[in-house]
Amino acid sequence: MNHKDWDLVNRRLVAKMLSELEYEQVFHAESQGDDRYCINLPGAQWRFIAERGIWGWLWIDAQTLRCADEPVLAQTLLMQLKQVLSMSDATVAEHMQDLYATLLGDLQLLKARRGLSASDLINLNADRLQCLLSGHPKFVFNKGRRGWGKEALERYAPEYANTFRLHWLAVKREHMIWRCDNEMDIHQLLTAAMDPQEFARFSQVWQENGLDHNWLPLPVHPWQWQEKIATDFIADFGEGRMVSLGEFGDQWLAQQSLRTLTNASRRGGLDIKLPLTIYNTSCYRGIPGRYIAAGPLASRWLQQVFATDATLVQSGAVILGEPAAGYVSHEGYAALARAPYRYQEMLGVIWRENPCRWLKPDESPFLMATLMEWDENNQPLAGAYIDRSGLDAETWLTQLFRVVVVPLYHLLCRYGVALIAHGQNITLAMKEGVPQRVLLKDFQGDMRLVKEEFPEMDSLPQEVRDVTSRLSADYLIHDLQTGHFVTVLRFISPLMVRLGVPERRFYQLLAAVLSDYMKKHPQMSERFALFSLFRPQIIRVVLNPVKLTWPDLDGGSRMLPNYLEDLQNPLWLVTQEYES
């Protein structure tokens, strides 16, 4: 570490803290003219240069930050927020731990990305590139990983890009909630995680332990095995409900979400999502049992919809299937109805198709979160894709909106299904720098249904309906507006200004794509009115002030955001300007 890097990661984090908390209306930045602003906090004044964008959000130039003659440190700002947010010393200390871990992760990212231009970065393979992304754009401390020390971070955090093997258990079938798609069997799952030599070794150990079809194999993250399962589930081992088999199989690489792992030994098979009892961003990263049995049914139903609906077929959009899932309840903790949720989410698995299974030979995948990034020379990665495509920026953006937003909006309006499409849930299939189609994932808890009964939803299995949240249309639309427009496009549109596309023009292009889609489907006019994207105001979701003051961070209950209904809608704004 050197002082220059330490100063840079602190400045970037302070800029993020000030801009997000100002957006969430914790305080207000006063304009001093000429793009100069100041924010007054108890005993301190922060000054900086920034541009206030169409969302009312400040894009702060981190190099211009000043707080009297003090060094620009994220810790200093957190201490100043203590009085503003009425935080206790204990709460500040907990978040200071997350702050330090985030700075450590950011330093590693700085090191790993050093010397790589935007063009260099997009030339990396998708697995390597996703390791170099910045993380959740809205939570200010997005790499807390509370529970991991330096050794665990270096071994399992994506920015270090290290690979590891999985620990395997055998679980008695009656002791496990298990659902496997009809088109997948356990042998296929195992061979997706082990080459023939390792599978033979695994089979030998399986037989040596006297195991048969009454047992199910279950992979476990090696950290979770060492820190939680080997101790907390000792009764299951002692009473013969589970058997530890050891480490087997391929090497795995952590994705940005930490829990989801990609096969680094043999690309293109199945990804595996495993619980980790660590606190990151807003909750403990376990896997709840509530959705396990319904997950494969939900993804199969969505795949059928996307294969038969003419608009979705034309879009080329793909659902990444979840062919199998399992969950093991802890007998002791399950008897404690009011125990913190983290004790109920310690052991399980979700198998998911890797995007490579759906790519054509001339396509390559990348996460949409990549478009929020820029290189060390402040060049947006989006610009490198546009340069490669040979298209102008407006044509490229129009294509992006067609392949991403139209399928999401059509799914919502026709079927009453909303997917929380943040930057890590959206994979784009690219051909020579041009977005071709979208690949969508994560339906266990991140899929919601409209409260009204739509006939197009009749074929959805009842088992899925029983565990899926249902919301009125005016709240369900927020999954697209907040989940995608605010959480993804809000961070892309300011970068496009550097590429010659003003923010208002950015959202005019989006409005034009949506208007064109709606004109082609006049029979759905009532649904478009029900799920209107052009109302003057939308919900402002407030995350950071809630997280920084949430009293139950030990996992007693999940953090719930606050909602304000005062956010001016850019789509309405640019439409009004266009019409006038």
UniProtKB/Swiss-Prot annotation:
EC number: 6.3.2.39
Molecular-function GO terms, alphabetical: aerobactin synthase activity; ATP binding; transferase activity
The UniProt record lists the keyword Oxidoreductase: no
Keyword set, alphabetical order: ATP-binding, Ligase, Nucleotide-binding, Plasmid, Transferase
Reactions the enzyme catalyzes: N(2)-citryl-N(6)-acetyl-N(6)-hydroxy-L-lysine + N(6)-acetyl-N(6)-hydroxy-L-lysine + ATP = aerobactin + AMP + diphosphate + H(+)
Matching InterPro entries: Aerobactin_biosyn_IucA/IucC_N, IucA/IucC-like_C, LucA/IucC-like
Stretch forming the signal peptide: none
Gene Ontology biological process terms in this record: aerobactin biosynthetic process; siderophore biosynthetic process
Disruption phenotype: Cells lacking this gene are not able to produce aerobactin and accumulate N-citryl-N-acetyl-N-hydroxylysine.
Family: Belongs to the IucA/IucC family.
Summary of the function given for this chain in its UniProt record: Catalyzes the attachment of the second N-acetyl-N-hydroxylysine to the carboxylic group of N-citryl-N-acetyl-N-hydroxylysine to yield aerobactin. Involved in the biosynthesis of the siderophore aerobactin which is a chelator that mediates the high-affinity iron transport systems induced under iron-stressed conditions.
The protein's name in its UniProt record: Aerobactin synthase
Organism: Escherichia coli
